[in-house]
């Protein structure tokens, strides 16, 4: 698919284009309105398409929990290895369309690697994530930024004292969730490891507050997010933050999302996942 089409869809889903402007630009690139509408299913997510770990996988215990946040209870999907052993914990933060089956599936994938994983719903203060993705996107724009960060920081504290964890907590997130993962790293001294996928970078003056080790995944074609890398790296080095950065050439924003035909980049996604699990193993299991 033409990368320009993927780029304007990214601008639309991140709030830089309204739907009318997006469809106008898409029609111009596609060669007409009919062709534009024919492309929409390829651009959107099909969460049922890419389920890898079923909810009833016998190796896991799954369900939903609530933990206290700054705005009240936050609902989260939970998955953990079956058994009585205590394991490290990982927070999985969704993209800018709320908590969906894909992110819950990612949490189960994490759990199968020996972690207790929770995927909080950022839209809990607004009644939870609706099924309609456009409505979910609109609700995400209504969230208060500071309160939302506090709700995810509260997840660190919840997991640190959870009776089924070792008290060691990591965090990972995608797109919007990647940026939120960076904010959790800035605001939680108890976080040990953070893995933002193509996430918006924090302000340089906030970087010295990061105590966690970072594993940074970026997409080579993601001009919008990559524009902030240079300043972020300079701040990380100046503050002596432990980090590794990988650039996945030929991949675009959201390359890990295997529910999106137009965005998923299999080779980049598989390599980033391997590196992520190895990173969490080294930082949370030792």
Language model segments and positions:
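Short beta-strand/loop motif that positions the catalytic acidic residue
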Residues: 216-218
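N-terminal cap/lid segment of alpha/beta-hydrolase-fold proteins
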Residues: 49-84
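Cap/lid segment of the alpha/beta-hydrolase catalytic domain
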Residues: 123-146, 254-260
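N-terminal export signals
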Residues: 10, 19-44
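Primarily recognizes the serine-hydrolase "nucleophile elbow" in alpha/beta-hydrolase
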Residues: 154-211
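N-terminal secretory signal peptides
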Residues: 1-21
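Short beta-strand element of the alpha/beta-hydrolase
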Residues: 86-95
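Alpha/beta-hydrolase active-site loop
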Residues: 138-162
């Amino acid at each position: 698919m033409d990368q320009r089409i993927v780029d304007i869809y990214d601008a639309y889903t991140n709030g830089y284009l309204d739907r009318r402007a997006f469809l106008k630009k898409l029609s111009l690139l596609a060669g007409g309105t009919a062709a534009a509408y024919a492309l929409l299913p390829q651009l959107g997510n099909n969460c049922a398409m890419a389920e890898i770990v079923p909810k009833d996988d016998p190796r896991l215990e799954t369900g939903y929990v609530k933990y206290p946040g700054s705005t009240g209870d936050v609902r989260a999907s939970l998955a953990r290895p079956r058994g009585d052993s205590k394991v490290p914990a990982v927070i999985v933060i969704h993209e800018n369309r709320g908590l969906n089956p894909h992110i819950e599936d990612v949490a189960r994938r994490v759990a199968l690697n020996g972690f207790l994983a929770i995927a909080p719903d950022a839209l809990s203060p607004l009644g939870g994530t609706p099924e309609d993705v456009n409505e979910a996107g609109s609700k995400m724009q209504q969230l208060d930024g500071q309160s939302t960060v506090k709700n995810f920081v509260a997840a660190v504290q919840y997991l640190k004292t959870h009776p089924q964890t070792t008290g060691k907590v990591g965090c990972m997130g995608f797109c919007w969730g990647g940026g939120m993962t960076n904010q959790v790293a800035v605001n939680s001294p108890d976080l040990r490891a953070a893995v933002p996928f193509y996430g918006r970078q924090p302000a340089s003056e906030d970087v010295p507050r990061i105590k966690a080790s970072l594993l940074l995944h970026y997409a080579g074609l993601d001009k919008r997010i990559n524009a902030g890398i240079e300043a972020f790296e300079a701040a990380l080095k100046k503050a002596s933050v432990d980090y590794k950065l990988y650039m996945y050439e030929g991949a675009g924003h959201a390359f890990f999302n295997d529910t999106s035909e137009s965005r998923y980049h299999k080779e980049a996604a598989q390599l980033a996942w391997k590196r992520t699990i190895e990173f969490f193993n080294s930082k949370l299991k030792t």
